[in-house]
């Protein structure tokens, strides 16, 4: 396998993994621990 193909596949997998983790953090179980700055600052 060529080096360029390996690097392309590696970067693609890394990007998909980071995106999946970000979505899980934003909408999954850990999202209950996130604070909402708009709720904290009510006028």
UniProtKB/Swiss-Prot annotation:
<protein>
    <recommendedName>
        <fullName>Protein PsbN</fullName>
    </recommendedName>
</protein>
<dbReference type="InterPro" id="IPR003398">
    <property type="entry name" value="PSII_PsbN"/>
</dbReference>
<keyword id="KW-0812">Transmembrane</keyword>
<dbReference type="GO" id="GO:0015979">
    <property type="term" value="P:photosynthesis"/>
</dbReference>
<keyword id="KW-1133">Transmembrane helix</keyword>
<keyword id="KW-0472">Membrane</keyword>
<dbReference type="Pfam" id="PF02468">
    <property type="entry name" value="PsbN"/>
</dbReference>
<comment type="similarity">
    <text>Belongs to the PsbN family.</text>
</comment>
<feature type="transmembrane region" description="Helical">
    <location>
        <begin position="5"/>
        <end position="27"/>
    </location>
</feature>
<keyword id="KW-0934">Plastid</keyword>
<dbReference type="GO" id="GO:0009535">
    <property type="term" value="C:chloroplast thylakoid membrane"/>
</dbReference>
<keyword id="KW-0150">Chloroplast</keyword>
<keyword id="KW-0793">Thylakoid</keyword>
<comment type="function">
    <text>May play a role in photosystem I and II biogenesis.</text>
</comment>
């Amino acid at each position: 396998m060529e080096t360029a193909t390996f690097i392309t596949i590696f970067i693609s997998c890394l990007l998909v993994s980071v995106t999946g983790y970000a979505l899980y953090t934003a909408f999954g179980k850990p999202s209950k621990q996130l604070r909402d700055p708009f709720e904290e600052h009510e006028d």
